[in-house]
C-alpha cells in the first residue's frame, strides 16, 4: 500500500488530432484502486532512463511500437522535447499488405520470422532464402522499403520539432540515439536506419545509433528506475521534515 507505481503513457502525437489524457486517467484510477501511488512517465523518457544511463541521461530515445513511435530528446536527465507519431509496426504491415495483395496477418508473420528476412542486405541483394516464392519476395522487399519510409518519417519530424522548439539546450558533445520497442528488432534494422540518417541535415552531432539491450523490457526497467528515484526523493523529504 502507498508504494510508487510508475506507468508509461505516449507523448502527444504531432500528426493526428488526438489526446491521451483519458487513457492516462483510466490507468491512474486502476493503479490507485490497488493502493499504489500512480505516477505517469512518457514512454520515450522511460526508455531514455534505461538506455542513456551511460551518457549522463543525455541523447535521443526512440520507442518504436506497433501503433505509435515515441521520441524524447534528453539533456542531463531532463526532457527537452517529447512527441509521438501515429505510425509504427502496424503501419508497415498495412501498407505492405495493400501494395502486395497479401493479408496483413501474413505480412506480420513474415516480418516477425527472423529466418526469412535480413534488412541489412540491399533491395537488389538476396534478402530471402532459397526456395522463397515470388509472393514472399515481393512482401520482403516491401517490408524493407516501408521500414525506410517510417524511419525517414521519424527523422524528418524529429528535425522539424527540434528546430521549432523553444529554449532547446546546447549539446556540447556528440550524443547517442538509442532505440527500443518491438518494431526495431527485425534483423538489419540499424542498417536501414543508418541509410536514412543524414548527419549533415540533423540538428545535433550524433556519435552512435544503437538498439537498447533487452529492447522489449527496456521501458519497464526505465519505469522502475523512475519509481525508485521518486521513492528515494520522498524518503529524503520525510527525513528533512523530521529534523
Where are the language model's segments positioned?
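Short beta-strand scaffold segments in enzyme catalytic cores
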Residues: 69-73
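Short, glycine/acidic-enriched loop or turn micro-motifs at the edges of active sites
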Residues: 46, 66-67
Amino acid at each position: 500500500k502507498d508504494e510508487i507505481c510508475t506507468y508509461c503513457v505516449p507523448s502527444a502525437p504531432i500528426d493526428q488530432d488526438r489526446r491521451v489524457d483519458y487513457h492516462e486517467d483510466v490507468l491512474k484510477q486502476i493503479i490507485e484502486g490497488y493502493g499504489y501511488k500512480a505516477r505517469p512517465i512518457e514512454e520515450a523518457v522511460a526508455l531514455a532512463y534505461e538506455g542513456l544511463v551511460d551518457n549522463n541521461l543525455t541523447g535521443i530515445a526512440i520507442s518504436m511500437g506497433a501503433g505509435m513511435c515515441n521520441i524524447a530528446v534528453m539533456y542531463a536527465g531532463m526532457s527537452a522535447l517529447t512527441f509521438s507519431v501515429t505510425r509504427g509496426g502496424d503501419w508497415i504491415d498495412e501498407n505492405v499488405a495493400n501494395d502486395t495483395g497479401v493479408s496483413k496477418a501474413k505480412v506480420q508473420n513474415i516480418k516477425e520470422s527472423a529466418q526469412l528476412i535480413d534488412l541489412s542486405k540491399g533491395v537488389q541483394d538476396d534478402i530471402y532464402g532459397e526456395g522463397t516464392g515470388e509472393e514472399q519476395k515481393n512482401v520482403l522487399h516491401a517490408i524493407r522499403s516501408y521500414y525506410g519510409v517510417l524511419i525517414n518519417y521519424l527523422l524528418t519530424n524529429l528535425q522539424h520539432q527540434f528546430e521549432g522548439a523553444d529554449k532547446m539546450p546546447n549539446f556540447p558533445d556528440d550524443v547517442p540515439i538509442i532505440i527500443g520497442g518491438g518494431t526495431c528488432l527485425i534483423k538489419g534494422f540499424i542498417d536501414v536506419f543508418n541509410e536514412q540518417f543524414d548527419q549533415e541535415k540533423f540538428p545535433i552531432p550524433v556519435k552512435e545509433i544503437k538498439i537498447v539491450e533487452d529492447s522489449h523490457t527496456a521501458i519497464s526497467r526505465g519505469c522502475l528506475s523512475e519509481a525508485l528515484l521518486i521513492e528515494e526523493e520522498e524518503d529524503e523529504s520525510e527525513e528533512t521534515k523530521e529534523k
